[in-house]
């Protein structure tokens, strides 16, 4: 019978989908009976595309043989031709430079850098720019902005009793720094996984990698943590973050019952939860040693890192229907059955964290490389090849270019799991270098641009947008280190170094679509609200940056207003103003000043508030 089992009855697939819509995909408490694990045909379950090992495909036949510049382009063009679509012309050098700077560093090029690139007529100038930008510290900061949301990075908890901050993370920034350095040093992604789960257990462990354990160590700590029900909530959050981030699976949906749609059983869930039940979240000195009682580090939590340690290994019983008082079978710690060729082996080394990391980073794991390749693709194209980047299961989207995704995943692993290799493949492709202009005939066939007949015009993240404004006003401070409040008027550092709170996220982050730091975020949302425009028009932050921009532009008193207007456009938008824009600016500047701001400050504010500051073509 086709459908989904719900308790003692079968629902049609359509009705099951309706059920999931109203009751959410993974309810906390199911109404199912206390029943034996549902019988799953594992061979059939492994036929799902995401559970099949990716393979390197033969290049498809294409008609426009001159268009591709990388392997990626062959797959994209073949799909376009099959859909009767044509690729767009290449973007201008100016557009490509701005796109590349913002995508790789999160900052636009300065007018001087733009002029240098536009004036460089040598072969390989674009390729050289890619390499230069990937060597900047800003590259790691840009990529880390993506990853920290996957790890639900934050520096406190969503709850606080009185003035008690014992469960807060004042040194969470050390995990952030480790992530930034990992991307800048091109740490192989399989090692990136191992170190975040088990840096303390590796054979060749280094104390410099211990902050990586913040992936687990910065998780939720609830009050009354000694109670089993509270511990179970913490384990659930850890399993959810781990499996969605690295595997693109919603395994925590199997906490109370077998997963309703994917071949993940309750036993699978408790097998993973047992790893976290055997792991403690702890504070340690930077070398991993215990903090001495009554020391400065103990009293003020200075010079410490928030990591984990193994406790006595503990296998868990299944909690029937999620009820910790109703125990079912004891489950050995192990990996997911659907991702094992036969029966998964039990974890026997301590908590099992290292074995879990190895299972995730195993090249034979069909999900890991696909998931990260798709996440990186999403960063540079605005939409993943799989539109649901943290759900590769039955309720997720099918890949738009399955052969391309698999080919990239295999080659990514063959190239030492190098993120820089992957980024290079993407940005050097003809697909990435297309312009973003609408072609009416193509739009009629593919209005959502699923098949990549043009580049997507994308809205900047809050980090890119705020940092670009600070750079334009000449106020940007490039230093890293400890976090500062984004509400602090003196904080002009890059946005990634702002404090992230689970309890009260900064207003600017909330208003401009920064994700909830309490949970793993699959991808950013793009919203347009009146509150955003009110912030842009009225906030003291924007006013101060407008003053800084006006001062920077008009510093040369010998230049004319026309020259100043041209300089402003070059600085903000990396282009020259049109005749209409020039005339409008000159007319505005001739008017008498109103209010507390000078005419140039008002003009600067208006240009900073423009939509063009928030988008990249």
What are these regions (language model features)?
Residues 201-295, 509, 521:
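Sequence context surrounding c-type heme c attachment/ligation sites in exported
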Residues 12-25:
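Bacterial N-terminal signal peptides
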Residues 29-67, 304:
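N-terminal pre-domain segments of enzymes
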Residues 2-15:
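Bacterial N-terminal signal peptides that target proteins for export
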Residues 66-98, 103-138, 157-204, 262-265, ...:
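Primarily short, surface-exposed interaction patches in extracytoplasmic proteins
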């Amino acid at each position: 019978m086709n459908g989904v089992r719900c308790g003692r009855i079968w629902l049609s697939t359509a009705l099951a989908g309706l059920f999931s819509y109203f009751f959410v995909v993974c309810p906390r408490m199911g109404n199912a009976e206390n029943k034996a694990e549902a019988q799953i045909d594992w061979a059939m379950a492994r036929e799902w595309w995401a559970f099949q090992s990716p393979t390197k495909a033969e290049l498809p036949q294409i008609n426009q043989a001159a268009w591709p510049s990388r392997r990626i382009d062959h797959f994209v063009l073949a799909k376009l031709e099959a859909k009767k679509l044509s690729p767009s012309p290449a973007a201008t050098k100016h557009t490509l430079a701005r796109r590349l700077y913002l995508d790789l560093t999160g900052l636009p090029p300065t007018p001087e850098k733009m002029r240098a690139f536009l004036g460089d007529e040598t072969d390989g100038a674009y390729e050289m720019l890619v390499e230069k930008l990937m060597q900047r510290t800003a590259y790691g900061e840009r990529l880390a902005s993506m990853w920290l949301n996957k790890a639900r990075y934050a520096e406190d908890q969503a709850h606080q009793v009185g003035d008690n901050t014992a469960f807060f993370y004042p040194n969470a920034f050390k995990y952030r720094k480790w992530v930034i350095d990992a991307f800048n040093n091109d740490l192989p992604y399989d090692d990136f996984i191992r170190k975040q789960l088990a840096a303390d257990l590796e054979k060749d462990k280094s104390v410099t990698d211990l902050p990586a354990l913040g992936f687990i160590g910065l998780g939720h700590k609830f009050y009354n943590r000694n109670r089993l029900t509270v511990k179970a909530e913490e384990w659930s959050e850890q399993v959810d973050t781990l499996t969605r981030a690295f595997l693109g699976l919603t395994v925590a949906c199997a906490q109370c019952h077998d997963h309703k749609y994917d071949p993940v059983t309750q036993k699978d869930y408790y097998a993973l939860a047992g790893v976290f039940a055997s792991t403690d979240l702890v504070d340690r000195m930077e070398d991993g040693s215990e903090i001495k009682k009554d020391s400065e580090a103990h009293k003020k939590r200075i010079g410490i890192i928030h990591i984990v340690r193994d406790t006595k290994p503990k296998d868990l019983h299944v909690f029937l229907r999620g009820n910790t008082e109703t125990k079912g079978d004891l489950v050995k710690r192990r990996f997911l059955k659907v991702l094992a060729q036969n029966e998964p082996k039990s974890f026997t080394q301590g908590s099992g964290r290292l074995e879990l990391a190895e299972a995730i980073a195993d090249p034979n794991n069909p999900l890991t490389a696909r998931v990260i390749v798709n996440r990186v693709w999403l960063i540079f194209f605005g939409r993943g090849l799989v539109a649901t980047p943290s759900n590769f299961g039955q309720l997720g989207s099918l890949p738009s270019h399955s052969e391309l995704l698999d080919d990239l995943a295999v080659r990514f692993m063959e190239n030492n799991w190098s993120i820089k290799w992957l980024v290079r493949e993407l940005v050097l492709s003809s697909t990435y270098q297309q312009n973003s202009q609408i072609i009416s005939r193509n739009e009629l066939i593919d209005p959502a641009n699923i098949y990549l007949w043009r580049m997507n015009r994308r809205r900047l993240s809050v980090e890119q947008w705020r940092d670009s404004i600070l750079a334009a006003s000449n106020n940007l401070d490039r230093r890293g280190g400890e976090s500062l409040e984004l509400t602090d008027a003196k904080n002009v550092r890059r946005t990634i170094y702002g404090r992230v709170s689970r309890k009260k996220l900064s207003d600017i982050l909330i208003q401009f679509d920064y994700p909830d730091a309490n949970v793993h975020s699959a991808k950013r949302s793009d919203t347009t609200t009146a509150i955003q425009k009110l912030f842009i028009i009225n906030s003291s932050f924007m006013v101060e940056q407008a003053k800084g921009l006006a001062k920077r532009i008009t510093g040369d008193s010998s230049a004319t207003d026309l020259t100043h207007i041209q300089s402003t456009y070059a600085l903000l938008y990396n282009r020259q103003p049109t005749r209409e824009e020039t005339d409008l600016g000159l007319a505005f500047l001739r008017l008498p000043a109103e209010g507390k701001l000078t005419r140039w400050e008002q003009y600067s504010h208006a240009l900073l508030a423009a939509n063009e500051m928030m988008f990249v073509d």
